[in-house]
């Protein structure tokens, strides 16, 4: 399936139904009063997250979503039926903006989350509402109100706990395929990964975390070079970054610093995320290879996805970091002795 992470659609809520002009018809009542019913409200437009969706591809083929109008009012004070609401399913992690103003309307992260994005128009009033002491038989009613309409810009940011960052051929795809059931394309040439991949990493009993592999970034990515920059948004929501550098690199620490520099240039909080340095392909490391010490309290791990070396230690470290950031913050006043308390 083609991966699409941005789309623009037009949505229009339903118009309200017309109010009715009608008069009571009863035997022996030659001049019955007005009894025109109100029109029904138009249908609303909702956005709803669906965890089974992973792309905005559907919106490349369907650009307009229109909710039904409300039914018109009828005689005998019968109101029209409300127009049916429509629901538009989107992947978890979708941001929705008003295309005209770029105002953020919704940031939808949880499965099954629903947001009303356009409200249907009110139904018009029937002539029963316009009778007065001087006009007992009004022939006036109201048309329905128009429903809200707007153009939406949608952007997908994948939901993951761990983001893999590295130069092309650093071993990101191999690692995610070994740790999870994800099966990205793997080959011995640069830019094998052309779209982000998600994998669920199982950890001990009943525990798991989600890992995201994005296309490799290169020096100058912040200025638009390479493929990785356009996909960096997909690791903005992660709790920790694993920066992968191959052990056969000319200078492992220099590559690490280059990658960190690109994250800093991109901004949007990526440079502030906790990170670990993962030195990959240790099975082909030179005999005199030594692990770098980049400082800044960065934990350094050495692994080989092919040989299985260091993978348990890596999973342990990633789980520790993820679970630590999942915990609710502890109260700074555990004894309940803060000022102003009631005994």
Curated annotation (Swiss-Prot):
Compartments, as annotated in UniProt: Cytoplasm
Record's keyword terms, sorted: Cytoplasm, GTP-binding, Hydrolase, Magnesium, Metal-binding, Nucleotide-binding
Molecular functions (GO terms): GTP binding; GTPase activity; magnesium ion binding
Top class in the EC scheme: hydrolase
Cofactor: Mg(2+)
Annotated SUPFAM superfamilies: Obg GTP-binding protein N-terminal domain (SSF82051), P-loop containing nucleoside triphosphate hydrolases (SSF52540)
UniProt keyword Ion transport, yes or no: no
Chief location of this protein within or outside the cell: cytoplasm
The UniProt record lists the keyword Magnesium: yes
Residues covered by the Obg domain: 1-159
A Pfam family reported for this protein in Swiss-Prot or TrEMBL: MMR_HSR1
Gene3D superfamilies registered for this protein in UniProt: GTP1/OBG domain, P-loop containing nucleotide triphosphate hydrolases
PROSITE patterns: G_OBG (PS51710), GTP1_OBG (PS00905), OBG (PS51883)
Residues reported in the UniProt entry to bind GTP: 166-173, 191-195, 213-216, 280-283, 304-306
Domain spans labelled OBG-type G: 160-323
Region (Disordered): 121-144, 322-343
Biased composition (Acidic residues): 331-343
Subunit and interaction comment: Monomer.
Entry function: An essential GTPase which binds GTP, GDP and possibly (p)ppGpp with moderate affinity, with high nucleotide exchange rates and a fairly low GTP hydrolysis rate. Plays a role in control of the cell cycle, stress response, ribosome biogenesis and in those bacteria that undergo differentiation, in morphogenesis control.
Protein name: GTPase Obg
Originating organism: Chlorobium luteolum (strain DSM 273 / BCRC 81028 / 2530)
Name of the gene: obg
């Amino acid at each position: 399936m083609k991966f699409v992470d941005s789309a623009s659609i037009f949505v229009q809520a339903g118009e309200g139904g017309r109010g009715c002009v009608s008069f009571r018809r009863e035997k022996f009542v030659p001049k019955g009063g007005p009894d025109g019913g109100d029109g029904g409200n138009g249908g609303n437009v909702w956005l709803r997250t669906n965890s089974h969706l992973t792309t905005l591809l559907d919106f490349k083929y369907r650009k307009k979503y229109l909710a039904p109008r409300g039914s018109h009012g009828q005689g005998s004070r019968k109101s029209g039926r409300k127009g049916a609401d429509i629901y538009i399913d989107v992947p978890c992690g979708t941001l929705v903006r008003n295309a005209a103003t770029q105002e953020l309307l919704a940031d939808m992260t949880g499965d099954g989350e629903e947001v009303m994005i356009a409200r249907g128009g009110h139904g018009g009033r029937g002539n029963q509402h316009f009778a007065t002491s001087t006009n007992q038989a009004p022939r006036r009613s109201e048309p329905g109100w128009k429903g809200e309409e707007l153009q939406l810009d949608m952007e997908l940011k994948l939901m993951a706990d761990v983001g893999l960052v590295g130069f092309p051929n650093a071993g990101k795809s191999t690692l995610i395929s070994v740790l999870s059931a994800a099966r990205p394309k793997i080959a011995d040439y640069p830019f094998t990964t052309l779209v982000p991949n998600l994998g669920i990493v199982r950890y001990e009993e009943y525990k798991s975390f989600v890992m995201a592999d994005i296309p490799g970034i290169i020096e100058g990515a912040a200025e638009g070079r390479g493929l990785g920059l356009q996909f960096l948004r997909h690791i903005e929501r992660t709790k920790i970054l694993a920066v992968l550098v191959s052990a056969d690199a000319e200078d492992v620490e220099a590559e690490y610093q280059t990658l960190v520099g690109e994250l800093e240039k991109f901004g949007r909080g990526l440079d502030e995320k906790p990170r670990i340095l993962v030195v990959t392909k240790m099975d082909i490391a030179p005999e005199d290879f030594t692990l770098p010490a980049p400082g800044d309290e960065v934990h350094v791990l050495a692994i080989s996805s092919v040989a299985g070396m260091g993978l348990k230690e890596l999973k342990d470290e990633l789980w520790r970091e993820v679970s630590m950031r999942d915990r609710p913050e502890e109260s700074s006043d555990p004894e309940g002795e803060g000022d102003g308390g009631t005994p």
